[in-house]
Amino acid sequence: MSGPELCVGAVAVRDGSILLIRRGTPPGEGLWSVPGGRVQRRETLVEAVRRELREETGLDCEVGDAVGWTELIGRRRHYVVVDFWVTVDSNAKPVAGTDASDAAWVAFQDLGRWDLVDGLLQFLTDHQVISGP
């Protein structure tokens, strides 16, 4: 295993819903998550959030404060993920792009019925993005 890889996530909420993408590539292929991915060389965290959101949903955003961070440690990879609050145009509709096979606004109360990446629901609850399952 190499050293940790730095990643970002974009947490967009509106009207009791959160923006999710269905991952089109590993890790978590086929599962739903917040938009995000690896930070590229010479890229700031804010630049990475904007790029990943645009690539995966076609949406532009304003990046706010960090929601929190988590570590995902597997047999071959170690990811450190910092998630940020983002604001998107309330009338814009997400369209799945690179690394995403689908994109949707999901009501908080429905999250428990979606196939989410491991730990996402707990992260969103722990960081008070949602009040619980």
Task: List PLM regions with ranges.
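NUDIX/MutT-family hydrolases
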Residues: 85, 95-127
